Each structure stands twice: as structure tokens, then as C-alpha cells.
Curated annotation (Swiss-Prot):
Family the UniProt entry places it in: Belongs to the DnaJ family.
Segments forming CR-type zinc fingers: 137-219
Residues reported in the UniProt entry to bind Zn(2+) 2: C167, C170, C193, C196
Name used for this protein in its record: Chaperone protein DnaJ
Originating species: Clostridium beijerinckii (strain ATCC 51743 / NCIMB 8052) (Clostridium acetobutylicum)
CXXCXGXG motif repeat locations: 150-157, 167-174, 193-200, 207-214
GO biological process: chaperone cofactor-dependent protein refolding; DNA replication; protein refolding; response to heat
Domain notes: The J domain is necessary and sufficient to stimulate DnaK ATPase activity. Zinc center 1 plays an important role in the autonomous, DnaK-independent chaperone activity of DnaJ. Zinc center 2 is essential for interaction with DnaK and for DnaJ activity.
Cofactor note: Binds 2 Zn(2+) ions per monomer.
Gene Ontology molecular function: any one: zinc ion binding
Alphabetical list of CDD domains matching this protein: DnaJ, DnaJ_C, DnaJ_zf
Lineage: Bacteria, Bacillati, Bacillota, Clostridia, Eubacteriales
Keyword hit for Metal-binding: yes
Domain J: residue ranges: 5-70
Length: 377
């Protein structure tokens, strides 16, 4: 189902509150639950869809990604593509049991086995770049602290030379079946085994390094190649650089969120840049050649005669490179004609002469008297 509308699947409007999302999911989950619709393939598919929608909309981070990018954020088609930039990864469809358990105390008949492989958590890291680094691209080294498999026990949690035994309560499944009576009816569900806490194993002698956790916290230095043209808010996914998975699960991803320090010279809007150029009244009237700063260095530009203050000129292709593309934005130069706040006597005389030549009316009493033999008339 391409371009899924998760709000529509739950019968909601975009922007629905957390409580509205929870109530809508609960109502539909009861209606389409497999235990109530055995053999109904359509109901089973509907149940999967509403679970998928709830898994996204109930998670603030996933919901924010969905609101910004739509369902493409989870199928790899969103984002920037190429060069390390791409859409956000798909989410763990095995999480339906956890969602249903939050309402009914169990994962339903289709819950995943909790002692199976578990994908590692994703990590988000914010990096701040200068304007120049964002424009031209840069390689950065960042330090990330994450959970990694314990090298001493290879992630088993048991001291080397010892073995973890199968949990006698759940027979290694990590779950026990429970029949619950709820206001909505009777449900046969599964719940986490209290004896082994869902792992299916009992560790009699925990690892001396990780104390039975199977993982340890480590800080790693990771090199990040940031392409030219990135901007504040861009997210760069580094696949497999998140926290390590459990019991053979795949590692999570590292999401590097970009923050760019504004330039003191340029104003950026997308891939275009804007700059002001100040010139005097005579130069605006007569035309002039000015030097304009661009991201690639200074260029000459001819301002035509009669240019008005606020006039915008475009320098095509002088903007910022588009991410993973040879295309570039444009630069816009706004001409600001400076009006002097004070004038000396000669400047005033020159302006009054200009007004006479233009046929403008003015009070001659305000005109400075011209000097005669070194003295004012």
C-alpha cells in the first residue's frame, strides 16, 4: 500500500492528539483482532495496517518524520538519495505485540518471540557546521557512545565456559499464554515470562565484564563525509552505526542531524543566497561597476544608470550547490542607495545646481551663498 495515510487508517485528522490516536487504535484493534476474525484474511490485513499506523503515530520521533516526509520516510524513498543521504529506515513490524500488550496485557496471537534477534536502537547526533563547511562539504570526526556486544562473552551475557539454561517456566519461548477477561471480552494473549524476563534463558553465572547484560557502553570515533549543500534540518543516516542488536539482531542506524551557523555576509534560502550592495546616489544615477562577494569569491557587476534603491539583480548559478548534484542555486544582489545624513557646503551647492538643471522648484533662500574673492557674498 504505497503512500499510506496513517491518520486516515485510524479514522483521524492530521494533528490528532496522543489520546485520540490511542482511542482510535484501541477501537479498531478490538474490531479487527485475529482472535475475533479467525480465517478472515481481510480483517487480518486491516489489523496489520492499523498496527503499522499506530506504531508510527504513537512514537513522537517516528510521528515527526511521518508528518514531514509521509510514509516515504519509512520505505527508503524520501530524503536526499545518494552520497550517504537517504530516507529513513522502515520500522520494526515485529512491534505489533508490544503495542497490543499496552492495552490488553499481552501481545495477541501473532506476537513475536521475545527471545529472538532484536535490532539495535537508532542513535541521533546533532553536528554544527560553519556556513562555509555546509556550502562546500566537509569530513568530520564525531564521538558516539553506544551499546556494543560484550567482547568477553560475545553478547551471550554468560561467563565464558558456562552455558545459559532454558527457562523452565516458558520452555525457552520467553512468553506465557494468558487468558484475560476485559470489558471488551475475553482475550487469549501472551505476556512476558517473569522468570527469564522474556529472554527464554536463565544465566546462572553472569559475565564478569557486562554483568549478564550482553552489552557494554563504548565511545567510538566515526568519520562522517558531509556533502556540499547541506542545510539546517537535513538528516544524514549512517547505516549500521547505531547500537548493536541483541541475540544476533542487526545494529541500528546513526542519524546525523545538521545544524548550520548563519553567515555574517550571506542570507541563505534553500540553495539561493542573498546579499546587499550599498552604493551612493551619484553612482546609482550614473551607473557604476561594483565588487560583489559570492560563495566562490568576488565578482564584478555593472549596475546600470538610474538604478533605484531596492532593485534586485540575479547572478545565475552563483548560489549553493544542490546536495549530490552539479546544479547550483542563484545569488541575488539587492542594491541599497545610501542617502547621506549630512552634507558639506560644496555637496549642497552641487545638489541645488542639479535641481536647477532638472527644473525643480525650491527656496533659493536655503542655497548657500557662493564665495567671492574668498568671502561669502
Amino acid at each position: 500500500m504505497a503512500n499510506k495515510d496513517y491518520y486516515e487508517l485510524l479514522g483521524l485528522q492530521k494533528g490528532a492528539s496522543d489520546d485520540e490516536i490511542k482511542r482510535a487504535f484501541r477501537k479498531l484493534a478490538v474490531k479487527y483482532h485475529p482472535d475475533r476474525n479467525q480465517g478472515n484474511a481481510e480483517a487480518e490485513e486491516k489489523f496489520k495496517e492499523i498496527n503499522e499506523a499506530y506504531q508510527v503515530l504513537s512514537d513522537p520521533e517516528k510521528k515527526a518524520k511521518y508528518d514531514q516526509f509521509g510514509s516515504a520516510a519509512f520505505d527508503g524513498s524520501g530524503g536526499f538519495g545518494g552520497g550517504g543521504f537517504g530516507g529513513f529506515d522502515g520500522f520494526d513490524m515485529g512491534g505489533f505485540g508490544d503495542i497490543f500488550e499496552s492495552f490488553f496485557g499481552g501481545g495477541g496471537s501473532n506476537s513475536r518471540r521475545r527471545n529472538g534477534p532484536v535490532r539495535g536502537n537508532d542513535i541521533e547526533y546533532t553536528i554544527t557546521l560553519t556556513f562555509e563547511e555546509a556550502v562546500f562539504g566537509v569530513e568530520k570526526e564525531i564521538s558516539v557512545t553506544r551499546n556494543e556486544n560484550c567482547e568477553h562473552c560475545h553478547g551471550s551475557g554468560a561467563e565464558p565456559g558456562t552455558n545459559a539454561k532454558t527457562c523452565p517456566t516458558c520452555s525457552g519461548s520467553g512468553q506465557v499464554r494468558v487468558q484475560r477477561q476485559t470489558p471488551l471480552g475475553s482475550f487469549v494473549s501472551t505476556s512476558t515470562c517473569d522468570t527469564c524476563r522474556g529472554t527464554g534463558k536463565i544465566i546462572e553465572k553472569p559475565c564478569s565484564e557486562c554483568r549478564g547484560k550482553g552489552s557494554v557502553r563504548k565511545t567510538r570515533k566515526i568519520k562522517v563525509n558531509i556533502p556540499a549543500g547541506v542545510d539546517t534540518g537535513n538528516v544524514m543516516p549512517l547505516r549500521g552505526q547505531g547500537e548493536h542488536g541483541l541475540r544476533g539482531g542487526s545494529p541500528g542506524d546513526l542519524y546525523v542531524r545538521i545544524n548550520v551557523t548563519p553567515s555574517k555576509v550571506f542570507t541563505r534560502k534553500g540553495n539561493d543566497v542573498y546579499i546587499d550592495a550599498h552604493i551612493s546616489m551619484p553612482k546609482a544615477a550614473l551607473g557604476t561597476e561594483i565588487t560583489v562577494a559570492t560563495v566562490d569569491g568576488n565578482v564584478k557587476y555593472t549596475v546600470p544608470p538610474g538604478t533605484q534603491s531596492g532593485t534586485m539583480f540575479r547572478l545565475k548559478g552563483k548560489g549553493i550547490q544542490r546536495v549530490n548534484s552539479n546544479g547550483k542555486g542563484d545569488q541575488y544582489v539587492k542594491v541599497i542607495v545610501d542617502i547621506p545624513k549630512t552634507l558639506n557646503k560644496e555637496q549642497k551647492e552641487a545638489l541645488y545646481d542639479f535641481m536647477r538643471a532638472s527644473g525643480e522648484e525650491f527656496d533659493e533662500a536655503n542655497v548657500p551663498k557662493k564665495k567671492l574673492f574668498g568671502k561669502n557674498k
